[in-house]
Amino acid sequence: MLLPIIMLTSGVANTVLSKYQDSIAEESEPIKSMAVLQSLNIFLGEACLWFYVLYKRHSQGPGYESLDHLPLKHKVFMALPAIMDICGSTLMNVGLLYTSASIYQMTRGSLIIFVALFATTLLKRTIGQLQWLSLSFVVLGVAIVGYSGSSSSIGSNPILGITAVLIGQFFLATQFTIEEYILSFIQVDPSELVAYEGTYGVFFVLLGMIISYYFIGSTTAGYHGWFDYSHVISRFNEVPALYVISGVILVSIAFFNVSGLAITKLHSATTRSLLDIARTFGIWIIAMAMGMESFHLLQFLGFVLLIYGIFTYHSIIKFPLAES
């Protein structure tokens, strides 16, 4: 019972606190470079899993399957999912800048669509007709959620935000497909794979920040743009609470990853997907309670269709007359 509570609490905290951080950091408009800094924080949280990995190595002894024995080329190959994660996470943080926390989280439900498409085309898996029907409900639900956001005053630029999140899901689905491919031929603890990805992510994001700031962000044309990191850092110095929020998010990301991996191992990926639905609902409720957004019937309808599609896809519930 403790693991689901940890996963739900940390998962809700990640999104709500990130959106709250955006809202108190912005001045006349969102600080664009905040998206990259938040991505760096995500990878720092993933890299913190090394503490968990080292604990498991010590507690389980010589029988623990480590990545240390792998050839260098295999370790380098693990940078590929990290690169996909960088693209996906940064785009999603851009989306969170411009739309509400609940619409951001609901739009993330489109991930299952891209994962299914890649599973059939790249991993050569077969998806049944009823599962494709389930995905059509997911598509319809995401479309309604997106329309409810674009047709209301939710966020400063909801169309840009929703588009960024959707493109981000494509990159994350690519990441998940590569991870599944890696884990299919390498017997290794998934937590160590995430720790490696976090380390690669920190390295590549920092390298990208240095290069992009030098050539773009520090120029007159890049002033207060996507790569002007001095802008967001100066804002952090003006509002010290932003540092505290980043620290809490970093810790919650580490707890979310550890608890999620443990739940997948002890129960199933389906259980984890159920908790992710509960996470989405929790984010929506808390965002409304905090006055960050209001109730929209169309958004609720889209959310219901999204849940129905995901539940039927995982066979948690069945379509009427499906067995007849």
UniProtKB/Swiss-Prot annotation:
Disulfide bonds: none annotated. GO terms for molecular function: UDP-galactose transmembrane transporter activity. The keyword Transport does not apply. It comes from Schizosaccharomyces pombe (strain 972 / ATCC 24843) (Fission yeast). Keywords: Membrane, Transmembrane, Transmembrane helix. GO terms for cellular component: Golgi membrane; intracellular membrane-bounded organelle; membrane. This is Uncharacterized protein C12G12.12. It is found in: Membrane. It holds the Pfam family Nuc_sug_transp. One of its GO terms (biological process) is UDP-galactose transmembrane import into Golgi lumen. It comes from the Eukaryota. The keyword Transmembrane helix applies. InterPro entries: Nuc_sug_transpt, UCP036436. SUPFAM superfamilies: Multidrug resistance efflux transporter EmrE. The chain crosses the membrane at residues 34-54, 76-96, 103-123, 127-147, 158-178, 198-218, 243-263, 275-295, 297-317. It is a multi-pass membrane protein.
